[in-house]
Amino acid sequence: MTDIAQLLGKDADNLLQHRCMTIPSGQLYLPGHDYVDRVMIDNNRPPAVLRNMQTLYNTGRLAGTGYLSILPVDQGVEHSAGASFAANPLYFDPKNIVELAIEAGCNCVASTYGVLASVSRRYAHRIPFLVKLNHNETLSYPNTYDQTLYASVEQAFNMGAVAVGATIYFGSEESRRQIEEISAAFERAHELGMVTVLWAYLRNSAFKKDGVDYHVSADLTGQANHLAATIGADIVKQKMAENNGGYKAINYGYTDDRVYSKLTSENPIDLVRYQLANCYMGRAGLINSGGAAGGETDLSDAVRTAVINKRAGGMGLILGRKAFKKSMADGVKLINAVQDVYLDSKITIA
């Protein structure tokens, strides 16, 4: 097992010993081996959705824990294939993307329709597929930031996918159209028995003010999570909160002083717990993103993110660039270290 305390360094005590005095853990619907029977059984999802959610939970190194380790590789569209795969050209071949997820013991592999369709007959029965339905792309000039549907729910279903995913840029001029598109897509996905995952991201240049990036503020990302759950996301993917007070700094929308005085603190675990509270207190699972590849600190950064997510009550990590921009062996090692956080019974809910 990974020496988690050593990787956390000077933050170890602050993260491993923290007690949450904001939102009590007893009010949350926490991950566990019985999550489908205990939590999802209340909702209106068809039985096939519950079956496919259980398939996710029963796969990989985290099988039976209620936690998820997902490998996402959709960056070939989002960030260009060259920028994404030049470090490891083997990942131009979709086969190797799926092999990385299998070798690392992930619950699921998430990618574009094209990537997964090209190898679906060989792999769809070996590891659960999550098809990302929409993407931003950076080939258009000048660059714009919008999400375009690249595939249909039916295409994902026909290749054997157990889940679909999509991004909404909440706060952008295009967000209301995206909400309508993805709400309809998620409705259809549930009809076909598939799990729905929303990348609930913020996007607006006004969210950066006085040198602070409020795209990762707990209050604004929390509301994005609430909207994600509103349109039927079974799992919400969110960037880890790094600050708070976005509503106040930008001076728009609605908030309450108690969000900052009682429901959050400066501890990152409490900030992520507020993100989770906005996922209907955990009735929709919260997975945090692993972030960009940063070099030598990738392992410690990924473990830190996993510890915060787990102790806040989150459901796992969706980590891609930190893994696939390394050799396959090093990528597997990094993903396994993250999984070790969720397998370690000593790392408890704060």
Where are the language model's segments positioned?
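N-terminal amphipathic alpha-helix/helix-capping segment at the start of soluble metabolic enzymes
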Residues: M1-H79, S84, A117-R126, Y274
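Alpha/beta enzyme core
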Residues: S25-L30, A63, G76-V109, G114-I287, ...
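Hydrophobic alpha-helical scaffolding
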Residues: N43, S265, G295-E296, M328
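PDZ domains - specifically the beta-sandwich core and the conserved carboxylate-binding loop
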Residues: S289-G291
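Histidine/acidic-residue-rich catalytic or RNA/ligand-binding cores of hydrolases
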Residues: T297-V303, S327-N336
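A short, acidic, flexible beta-alpha connecting loop/helix-capping segment that sits on the rim
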Residues: R321-S327
